[in-house]
Amino acid sequence: MELIVKEESKTDYNYGSDPYKRDIKTLLNTGLVVIDKPSGPTSHEVAAWVRNMLNLVKAGHGGTLDPKVTGALPVALGNTTKCVPIWHIPPKEYVCLMHLHDDAKLEDIENIFKEFTGRIHQRPPLKAAVKRSLRIRKIYEIEILEIDGRDILFRTKCQSGTYLRKLVDDMGEALGTSAHMQELRRTISGPFYENEAVYLQDLLDAYISWKEDGNEEELRKLVKPLEYGLQHLKKIIVKDSAVDAVCHGATLYSSGVSKIEKGIGTDEVVLIETLKGEAVAVGKPLMNTKDMLKTEEGEVVEITRVIMEPGIYPRIWKKRNKNDKSKPESKKN
């Protein structure tokens, strides 16, 4: 990540905090944990178990896995649930065991796998909790890892919302043998990887260690601040004076920007951060990095989702009449 300074600015440490230095109670309500989901429970059940074991009001999972599917299941804790839709932006990766119902030549198998790379059409399965309309999904990568008789082990990197069971069914039909998905494991879910996933029992043990012995070290290793789950987004760093206005949903203006990440375009989602590294909001850039650096006034990011609660930073802006299109007033930082 390369940040370009638009205007040097200092932050006041009387407000906000470094995300990695939050007290443990705040972390549990503004954090996340990546669970290694076991075979059996639903994703909703796993999220509910995490909520109950950590004594939270709410928790939500990012990306449903069928009961028999294992692997990386990110769980948003407390107020972090508002970040879940952002986790669906990057691709997901799976390792799948596919079983053919008849013999097939290696050359035919390889050709079918090539055919199913790129844009594909899918209709959600009957059990899906969404409307069964035809949709386009992108298969970025698909690689055969091993073939043993009629069993094919493969890895695929695909767009969020791709049904792997349906992908296997469709490939089996195209091959002329028919096929079914025997096993599936998610290895990457957006910005989260299976090697950082933790077992439910380990999370419970760490929580008990903190509650009974006051030892929060192990719990901090497992629970990450919400900002950890937004690291895949390009960043715009704002001055303290702009934070609370953005927390109220106001469009980000050029005068509130301190630093901009190189390479931002208008076709992506960007993260608005404080000078301390706290996530404030996400939004749609109205111009690219180069133009943001040049402009002295005007709107630069349209806010689409506010993350930080209002009131953490001081309010040093004035409400405008809804019909007033002029730039909001704020003090220089």
From Swiss-Prot:
Active site: 66 (nucleophile)
Function, as annotated: Could be responsible for synthesis of pseudouridine from uracil-55 in the psi GC loop of transfer RNAs.
Source lineage: Archaea, Methanobacteriati, Methanobacteriota, Methanomada group, Methanococci
Domain of life of the organism encoding this protein: Archaea
HAMAP family linked to this entry: TruB_arch (MF_01081)
Electron transport recorded as keyword: no
UniProt-listed Enzyme Commission number(s): 5.4.99.25
Family stated for the protein in its record: Belongs to the pseudouridine synthase TruB family. Type 2 subfamily.
GO biological process: box H/ACA sno(s)RNA 3'-end processing; mRNA pseudouridine synthesis; rRNA pseudouridine synthesis; snRNA pseudouridine synthesis; tRNA pseudouridine synthesis
Signal peptide segment: none
Organism whose genome encodes this protein: Methanococcus maripaludis (strain C6 / ATCC BAA-1332)
A GO term, aspect molecular function: RNA binding
Family annotation (CDD domains): PseudoU_synth_hDyskerin (cd02572), PUA_Cbf5 (cd21148)
InterPro entries for the chain: Dyskerin-like (IPR012960), PsdUridine_synth_cat_dom_sf (IPR020103), PsdUridine_synth_N (IPR002501), PUA (IPR002478), PUA-like_sf (IPR015947), PUA_sf (IPR036974), tRNA_PsdUridine_synth_B_fam (IPR004802), TruB_arch (IPR026326)
Catalytic activity of the protein: uridine(55) in tRNA = pseudouridine(55) in tRNA
Claim: tRNA processing is one of the keywords in the record: yes
Entry keywords, A to Z: Isomerase, tRNA processing
Pfam families reported in the protein's UniProt record: DKCLD, PUA, TruB_C_2, TruB_N
Boundaries of every PUA domain copy: 233-308
Protein's name in the database: Probable tRNA pseudouridine synthase B
